[in-house]
Each structure stands twice: as C-alpha cells, then as structure tokens.
Amino acid sequence: GSEMCIRDRRKEGISIPIIVMNPEFSSFNVLFENQLEPEVYSFRLLDAMIKETERRGITSYPIHIKIDTGMHRLGFQPEDVPEVCRRLKEQSGVVARSVFSHLVGSDSYIFDDFTKKQLDTFTRVAAELEAGLEYKVIKHILNSAGIERFTDYQMDMVRLGIGLYGVSASGQKGLRNISTLKTTILQIQNVPAGDSIGYSRMSYVKRD
C-alpha cells in the first residue's frame, strides 16, 4: 500500500521533505520512521503530535499548520492562531515549518471575490502566526488554478496538483497534456432530436 510506497522511496534515496496530508493518528509510526512531515489541522492532532515526540525523545519535528479560510473541510480557524502559537511555544517536540490553506474556487471567475477574501484572510493569519511564533515559516495557498490566475500570491511555495498531468484547471493552453485517453466505439445509434442521453438526462440531442 501507500506505506510500502513511502518506505521504498526513502530506500531509493529520496530525502527531500514529504508532506502528508490529512494524517491519521494510526499513521504516527510510519510518519516518524520515514521522516514524513504531517499536516496539522486541529488541536487534538497537534497535542497528539507533541505527546508522541516527547515519548520518542524527539525535538523540532517539522509540521505544517493548515488554516481553514473557507473550504470548511479541515483546518484551524483564523481565531485559533493565538492558541496555536501558545501551544507551540511552550514545547520543543514540534516546530511549524509552514502554514497553508486551500482555495475553494480559484478556477472560476464567478468566485473571484470569495477567492480574494480567502487570500486576504490567509495573508493576515500567516503574518499573525509568524509574529506569535517569532520566526519565519513557509507560506503557501495556491493550487493549480491559483498558480495560473493569482500570480501575486505565490508567496514561498505553490502546490501544483492536476497541473502535473498537463491539465489546466482554468482553461489555459500553456500546459502540455502528459496522457491520452483512447477507447473503442461499440455502437452508433440514431437518436431523435429532443431525446436525452445518459444519466440524469443532463444532455439533449439538438438534431436527429
């Protein structure tokens, strides 16, 4: 599974930092054994990480603080930052290497006002975190569409997702697709104009 894949990558000499998104408590052994850096999104997970580093006698283990600026899946709330700083400063087991958030609709112009609000919130919260911790952290929020459309917010790092496959989330033509989908035509039907095709009747035929 994924644990074997990670171990194999480390054995092959891949030594660069690897961030683990949405880690589970049951994965702590794999995290520490393979020097993986977890996303930390809640006080429960933060406290568990601190406790585990203390148990193992580890100091300054890198973690990545996730802030919820509008996706509402995982992440600390912006108002949690002072308490996050307090808990980090009163221990030595973990250290914040980066702070990040996730954009909801950076691929669509209709969400630009909301995206700008997310970007402004993150900029403010990241500065508050750095001020509270009294050291600099890596800041990143842009996904594939954000990289293309909000270049002023590339900060210290960006996260290229679907763009790795040459697919533009916002219709840009500068990326080269790395894969090709091929299939075989099994049947050709004559469908009268006005009839629907496929699930949920989402597509209608305009002509015979």
Predicted regions and their residues:
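Anionic-ligand-binding alpha/beta catalytic cores of soluble enzymes and soluble regulatory domains
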Residues: 112-207
